């Protein structure tokens, strides 16, 4: 009888572990999510800053510009004069200096002008006509957005040229005429009807309403405020905005050798810089202390470089008008901190009296709206047009934005309001329910990417660069622009500094750090990756190793 | 930007490693770099668990599970058998834990290194017998808590990297999972060399060290940036190359993430800082010569 042996197999393995669903161990799963970056959240025009910087980093400049002009038709303008709250919010600010967003925007905006890139034309043409009253930043932005939606738009402008503060208020050395003309020409090429030298009064409104489906009021605030101590009838006393406007129209106001500017905001410093370029010595008297002047810090630095003397925390008590000169009795003050921000209540400090003498005085203490008669047709409060969150006035079909409404007086804020009004007008005309895009930003603001969510290991320190400045002696010779744009190399290296907070750039870290090979690259997906549900154990390494907070872990319940 | 690592799909999903396991991540880059024409040798360890519950395997290559003391001897036998059969392309890799390398398997490894046997030996070093409940090994660092050193280990970690370099083997490298590209590059480099190649990979054990599930790569990088575990290569016991060294990051940033160090007082933290600084300076001198 033959002996039988038990056969021992040479290979014991009969299969692979990938038949085991380790995903059942999990209590949370990673979700790819485009999240709100702090810069985007702070941007007055709701600009998708990480998106266009990412495109610039890839040298896709036309695409970057196209992403910019979705929200703002004037990147070359805002790249120069925006107060850039984005940089104040930038997560990199806590690390090695905020990304130079404003300078990057200028480079792309200028490139668009030099390359002659044109704005996209509307894809549909609607029959409805919209009247935009006021051709400043808010009105032009609203007209642009409405035109993109296909509406027929007419802009009514009381002055001979469009632009408002951009044409008449900002000195040429901050925004050259060529740049502004280029930006405007490109916008008007979309086919917008313009009626310049056309002042719309309150009693014109009802006739406008017959011809137009909706009205946007963007009248601005060009009337310079005055101070009771000063007689504005005297030829030696100038109003700030009017002074800037005259110079921008090409006049040369006769100021004399010594000019005193009253005010501490951006307009006051623009007035001071303009007077310096006209050859005068300039002193600025401001109520606020030096470290709390309302002007932007870089504007203050430039003014000081240009030899403007700043008397911060000072108030004019008495004005002595002579035939050739004005003598100002001044006193040092501190501001009463018990008053809310924006309300100035100076407390004179006795014994600090001093005297300043000047050949002319320019008042730059703020601007008011001109709303005579408008209170009979719409609700006005504190000299401003009352509007709701959607910028609708009390009168159906009439919307308002920019400086004529209670908004921060920045050009970018006005551009943002014009855009917001355009979507409100569109909603009003199409009778949609209010779920606009601008509201979604507010809803998501809780989910802003925080500094702690950025994985610094992936971002070696890299110094921030700033725009260069023309040497002072050269600056004072003329009204040429003083800030020097980034060059190509600077633009490349500085755009690389962007963390792209909350915006996936397909770095593949989530893929490489998964011990379970549960992350799959898939370029056909908007989120670029998918999670293999059957294997993911929910460890969260992909979330932790994402350099920019674009993956979040979501708890799973009821499994 | 980002990592670029070429992988062959040898390591499978569905393996039994804990969520976030650094050792599984290390195995991914080791076997996916070596490719399917490789024979693995694995002693008892977490690696044996991750290799798969019989009869399933997480690695699409032959794996021989040997005894705890015999990884290097088993690898020697397989490498010599392949040579005797005229096979000069199949690679042999032993993948063992620190218990199976620093302690129990050390004799066979040292003698194989002395004979310059032709295989790759990779130690996945999680600084203790983590598979059996976190007892101390000779790799456990000074003052770290383990189940068998409840007041903290009274002696320092054995410097196996330098011991192996002192065998004057063709290639010795240190690596860790927070630097996956560096790890894969070192495995690829070892693959292209003949003789005994040794890589010690620091693989933080989430459970044994007391770490969050997502903290493996982070603590691994802190080990490097604090100077606890510099990443470097030594060729023929002589030529030293530094890849990633100390950035002067204070040791407390590394220790405070780990529950195994939470009993430390300030004086002990400073003591560890001094030891780490001294070790880093001593090692650093070798890169300049």
Identify the function of each model-found stretch.
Chain A
Residues 152-196, 247, 272-318, 435-447:
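Rossmann-like dinucleotide-binding cores of NAD(P)H-dependent redox enzymes
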Residues 235-258, 339-408, 415:
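FAD-site-proximal beta/loop scaffold in flavoenzymes
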Residues 22-42, 65-84, 116-131, 167-168, ...:
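Ferredoxin-like iron-sulfur electron-transfer modules
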Residues 107-124, 182-199, 224-278, 379-396:
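Glycine-rich dinucleotide-binding loop and its adjacent helix/turn
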Residues 271, 404-429:
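A conserved FAD-binding loop/helix module that cradles the flavin
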Residues 63, 124-133, 181-229, 318-328, ...:
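Feature captures the FAD/FMN-dependent oxidoreductase FAD-binding
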Residues 128-154, 268-276:
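N-terminal Rossmann-like FAD-binding beta1-loop-alpha1 element of flavoenzymes
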Residues 37-58, 79-108, 154, 161, ...:
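Iron-sulfur cluster-binding cysteine motifs and their immediate structural context
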């Amino acid at each position: 009888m033959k002996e039988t042996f038990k056969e021992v197999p040479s290979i014991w393995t009969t299969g692979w572990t990938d038949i085991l669903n380790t995903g059942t161990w999990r209590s949370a799963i990673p979700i790819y999510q485009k999240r709100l970056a702090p810069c985007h959240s702070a941007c007055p025009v709701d600009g998708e800053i990480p998106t266009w910087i990412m495109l610039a980093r890839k040298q896709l400049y036309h695409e970057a510009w196209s992403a910019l002009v979705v929200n703002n038709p004037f990147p070359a303008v805002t790249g120069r004069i925006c107060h850039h709250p984005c940089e104040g919010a930038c997560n990199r600010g806590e690390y090695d200096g905020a990304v130079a967003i404003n300078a990057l925007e200028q480079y792309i905006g200028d490139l668009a002008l030099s390359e002659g890139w044109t704005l996209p034309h509307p894809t549909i043409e609607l029959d409805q006509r919209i009247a935009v009253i006021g051709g400043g930043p808010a009105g032009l932005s609203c007209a642009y957005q409405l035109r993109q939606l296909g509406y027929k738009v007419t802009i009514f402008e009381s002055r001979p040229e469009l632009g408002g503060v951009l044409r008449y208020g900002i000195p040429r050395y901050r925004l050259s005429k060529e740049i502004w003309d280029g930006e405007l020409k490109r916008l008007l090429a979309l086919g917008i009807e313009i009626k310049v030298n056309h002042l719309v009064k309150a009693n014109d409104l009802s006739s406008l309403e017959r011809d137009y489906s909706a009205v946007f009021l963007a009248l601005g605030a060009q009337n310079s405020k005055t101070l009771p101590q000063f007689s504005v009838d005297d030829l030696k006393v100038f109003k700030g905005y009017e002074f800037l406007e005259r110079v921008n129209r090409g006049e040369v106001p006769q100021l004399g050798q010594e000019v005193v500017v009253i005010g501490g905001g951006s307009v006051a410093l623009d007035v001071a810089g303009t007077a310096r370029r006209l050859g005068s010595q300039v002193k600025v008297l401001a109520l606020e202390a030096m470290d709390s002047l309302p002007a932007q810090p870089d504007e203050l630095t430039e003014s000081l470089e240009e030899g403007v003397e700043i008397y911060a925390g000072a108030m004019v008590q008495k004005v002595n008008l002579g035939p050739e000169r004005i003598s100002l009795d001044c006193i040092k003050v501190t501001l009463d901190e018990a008053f809310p921000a924006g309300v100035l209540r100076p407390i004179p400090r006795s014994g600090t009296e001093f005297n300043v003498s000047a050949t002319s005085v320019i008042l730059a203490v703020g601007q008011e709206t001109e709303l005579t008669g408008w209170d009979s047709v719409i609700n006005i409060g504190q000299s401003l047009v009352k509007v709701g969150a959607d910028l609708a006035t009390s009168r159906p079909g009439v919307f308002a934005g920019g400086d004529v409404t209670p908004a921060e007086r920045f050009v970018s804020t006005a551009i943002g309001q014009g855009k917001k009004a355009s979507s409100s007008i569109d909603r009003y005309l199409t009778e949609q329910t209010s779920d606009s895009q601008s509201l979604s930003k507010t809803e998501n603001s809780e989910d802003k990417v925080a500094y702690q969510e950025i994985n610094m290991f992936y971002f070696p320190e890299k110094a921030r660069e700033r725009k260069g400045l023309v040497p002072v002696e050269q600056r004072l010779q003329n009204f040429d622009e003083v800030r020097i744009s980034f060059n190509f190399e600077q633009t490349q290296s500085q755009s690389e500094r962007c963390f792209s907070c909350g915006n996936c750039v397909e770095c593949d870290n989530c893929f490489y750090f998964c011990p379970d090979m549960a992350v799959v690259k898939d370029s056909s997906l908007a989120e670029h990756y998918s999670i293999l549900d059957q294997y993911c154990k929910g460890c969260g390494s992909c979330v932790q190793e994402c350099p920019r907070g674009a993956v979040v872990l979501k708890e799973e319940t009821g499994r | 930007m980002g990592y670029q690592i070429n992988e062959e799909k040898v390591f499978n999903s569905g393996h039994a490693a804990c969520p976030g396991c650094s050792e599984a991540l290390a195995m991914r880059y080791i076997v996916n770099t070596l490719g399917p024409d490789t024979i693995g040798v694995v002693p008892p360890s977490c690696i044996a668990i991750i290799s798969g519950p019989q009869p399933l395997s997480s690695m699409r290559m032959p794996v021989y599970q040997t005894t705890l003391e015999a990884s290097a001897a088993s690898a020697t036998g397989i490498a010599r058998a392949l040579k005797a059969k005229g096979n000069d392309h199949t690679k042999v890799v032993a993948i063992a834990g620190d218990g199976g390398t620093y302690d129990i398997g050390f004799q066979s490894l040292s003698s194989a290194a002395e004979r310059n046997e032709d295989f790759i030996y990779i130690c996945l070093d999680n600084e203790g017998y983590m598979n059996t409940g976190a007892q101390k090994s000779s790799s456990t660092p000074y003052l770290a808590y383990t189940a068998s050193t409840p007041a903290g280990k009274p002696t320092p970690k054995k410097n196996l990297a330098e011991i192996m370099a002192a065998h004057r083997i063709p290639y010795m490298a240190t690596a860790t999972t927070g630097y996956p590209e560096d790890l894969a590059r070192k495995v690829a480099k070892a693959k292209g060399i003949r003789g005994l190649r040794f890589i010690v990979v620091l693989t933080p054990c989430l459970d044994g060290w007391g770490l969050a599930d997502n903290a493996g790569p982070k603590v691994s990088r802190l080990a490097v940036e604090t100077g606890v575990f510099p990443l470097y290569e030594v060729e023929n016991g002589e030529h030293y190359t530094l890849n990633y060294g100390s950035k002067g990051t204070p040791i407390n940033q590394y220790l405070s993430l780990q529950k195994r160090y939470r009993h430390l007082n300030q004086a002990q933290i400073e003591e560890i800082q001094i030891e780490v600084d001294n070790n880093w300076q001593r090692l650093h001198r070798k890169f300049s010569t």
